[in-house]
């Protein structure tokens, strides 16, 4: 079974997650490859798709959303999973007692759930390097505002065991698929 792990990233943390998922699927005996959404013109060669994107301010990166909308017919006809990376820090619960990963779900997932009927979705913690070159006006402004810059915890917060477990779950579901599905 051939699996595409397509992703949209801004600074590379989502690339790392996509590559880890593809490696885990490959280790489970599937043929998987991670590719940026901008490099994928056709999903027809793939039997299943895992689609991921970084999220900023509760919104998935536009290239991931555009990819999902553009390929919605083909994606809805095969097994699909969605993931997002973005929340920073190690706290699983926010100051209001809510699950950080659940409340960080990108707003676009509601629309994409209706369009694509994904088998699952997951939000993972992301990474932030305050010394990375800024992308876009918003990031340039944050870099020049010390209070805003210091409000974001710096570091790599990706939970590799959680990512591996999610990929293993996908692999198990795909291995249980009747061939030709």
Summary of predicted features, one role per range:
Residues 1-7, 148-153:
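General secondary-structure propensity
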Residues 2-28:
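N-terminal beta1-alpha1 ligand-phosphate binding loop
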Residues 8-9, 53-54, 85:
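Glycine-rich His-Gly loop
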Residues 16, 24, 28, 33, ...:
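FMN-binding flavodoxin-like domain, especially the glycine-rich phosphate-binding loop
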Residues 37-39:
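Conserved SAM/SAH-binding loop
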């Amino acid at each position: 079974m051939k699996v595409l792990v397509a992703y949209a990233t801004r600074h590379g943390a989502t690339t790392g997650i996509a590559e880890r998922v593809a490696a885990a699927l490959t280790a489970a005996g599937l043929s998987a490859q991670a590719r940026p959404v901008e490099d994928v013109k056709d999903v027809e060669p793939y039997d299943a798709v895992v689609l991921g994107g970084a999220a900023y301010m509760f919104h998935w990166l536009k290239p991931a959303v555009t990819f999902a909308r553009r390929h919605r017919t083909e994606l809805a006809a095969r097994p699909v999973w969605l993931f997002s990376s973005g929340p920073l820090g190690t706290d699983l619960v926010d100051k209001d007692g809510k699950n950080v990963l659940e409340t960080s779900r990108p707003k676009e997932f509601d629309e994409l759930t209706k369009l694509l009927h994904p088998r699952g979705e997951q939000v993972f913690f992301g990474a932030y390097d305050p010394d990375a070159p800024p992308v876009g006006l918003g990031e340039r402004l944050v870099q020049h505002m010390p209070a805003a810059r210091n409000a974001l915890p710096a570091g790599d917060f990706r939970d590799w065991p959680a990512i591996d477990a999610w990929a293993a779950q996908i692999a198990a579901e795909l291995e249980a698929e009747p061939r030709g599905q």
